[in-house]
Amino acid sequence: NMRREGYEFAVSKAEVLYHTDERGKKLEPIELAYVDVPEEFSGSVIQKLSQRKGELLGMTPINGGYTRLQFSIPSRGLIGYRGEFMTDTKGNGIINTSFEGYEEYKGDISYRKTGSLIAYEDGEAVTYGLFNAQDRGTLFIGPGEKVYAGMIIGENPRTEDIEVNVCKTKHLTNTRSSSADEALRLVPPKILSLEQALDYIDTDELLEVTPTHLRIRKKILDSTLRYRANKK
């Protein structure tokens, strides 16, 4: 019924529920994570989980060239990690978790090491604009797609966000060059599934879910207001 009515959802990154102890200290949920990975991938997994405030409790070799890792880790440290985990272990890793209890807040976590490519203006993405934008990172859209200012249209391999104008058309002149006649080649866009998009979004971003489209956007669409908010 909701699909038929054309409803749209704006979904934020998952958040955990914090508690406060009798001394006013902030507490957060902690989980025990049991991770079975091929030995050659154990170093990468340990590094990633440690960056997410995980504490390695044990490391045991098991059958088939696998290593079993045991971590104590904040629940929020596992948010958005499973997709990354499957990539790092080439689909050969297994991770199981169980709730351990509440402990003192472990500190801030940087969920994503990359930035976003953000649409500069409303309009329709064109080949020329996308061709110039693809040098900045990985695109999530192709030509002909409608975009709006503040919409995320790709991923920047560096940490900062960049505004790009994917609606920009080539300035036409009366003089034609040989290079102008060459077709612009676009790298196929990376199409995110619902699960991948939920893993990707950062705390200042939203995922718009409609019956026909998935769109990622900044919570604050206006670039000036977004800049001011980030300065606070």
Describe each model-derived feature in a short phrase.
Residues 1-232:
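Accessory interaction regions appended to the cores of large information-processing enzymes
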